[in-house]
């Protein structure tokens, strides 16, 4: 379980997050949404251990987070892949740094690529892949170390609508299959409503928890309902419009 208590953080000398209290249970998919500058990415970087926080605590499985760790896998919008390595070696890179024996890490990489639909692409290079395929490699790399918690920072923001829909459904299937805790940062309201089992709305900076919503659209998808059917459901449309109105309230209040 991820537990965040009374978290305060600065960014560039200014308050970025203020009194954040969140819990992410095992098997849940938490989505954080808010206007630009609300501290979404700062929150992910704090959980990942990339930057320090000023007050409060972040704990995963009862252990305080004070730096990066293999129990947290991170996927970025710009992937951060190594262009001089092939796909398989990119996925296996973290395992290599951890001292995993070569044959074992290549087998793990193969299995992760199979999970994300890139079996057979092991020897291709990053420049030979589409944007969506590169994000699949990034997800496979993050999963290779078998983390307890998967963190994703607007991973589909630069993708076209069709590819973004494919990646959303892939991530939900992986979430169901692995049972991992997932925390997704996004600025896309429809994506947030579709994918979250719990949706957290942040206020304009400094970010505070404005509202928490329990949603069931992601569970309906993994139970077999199509994404098209879900997104055309009046309940989904109403929730999307409600969340949109809350985000616009924050934009107007601080404009």
UniProtKB/Swiss-Prot annotation:
Nucleotide-binding in keyword set: yes
GO cellular component, as recorded: plasma membrane
Swiss-Prot/TrEMBL keywords: ATP-binding, Cell inner membrane, Cell membrane, Membrane, Nucleotide-binding, Translocase, Transport
Predominant location: membrane
Membrane topology per record: Peripheral membrane protein
InterPro entries to which the protein is assigned, alphabetical: AAA+_ATPase, ABC_transporter-like_ATP-bd, ABC_transporter_ATP-bind, P-loop_NTPase
Domain ABC transporter intervals: 2-229
GO MF term set: ABC-type taurine transporter transporter activity; ATP binding; ATP hydrolysis activity
Recorded superkingdom: Bacteria
Binding site for ATP: 34-41
Coiled-coil annotated residue ranges, if any: none
Compartments reported by the entry: Cell inner membrane
Transferase among keywords: no
E.C. number(s) listed in UniProt: 7.6.2.7
Catalytic activity: taurine(out) + ATP + H2O = taurine(in) + ADP + phosphate + H(+)
Pfam families: ABC_tran (PF00005)
PANTHER family found in the cross-reference section: TAURINE IMPORT ATP-BINDING PROTEIN TAUB (PTHR42788:SF18), TAURINE IMPORT ATP-BINDING PROTEIN-RELATED (PTHR42788)
Similarity-based family: Belongs to the ABC transporter superfamily. Taurine importer (TC 3.A.1.17.1) family.
Assembly with partners or alone: The complex is composed of two ATP-binding proteins (TauB), two transmembrane proteins (TauC) and a solute-binding protein (TauA).
Biological role: Part of the ABC transporter complex TauABC involved in taurine import. Responsible for energy coupling to the transport system.
NCBIfam families, per the entry: PRK11248.1
The protein, known as: Taurine import ATP-binding protein TauB
Source organism: Shigella flexneri
Taxonomic lineage: Bacteria, Pseudomonadati, Pseudomonadota, Gammaproteobacteria, Enterobacterales
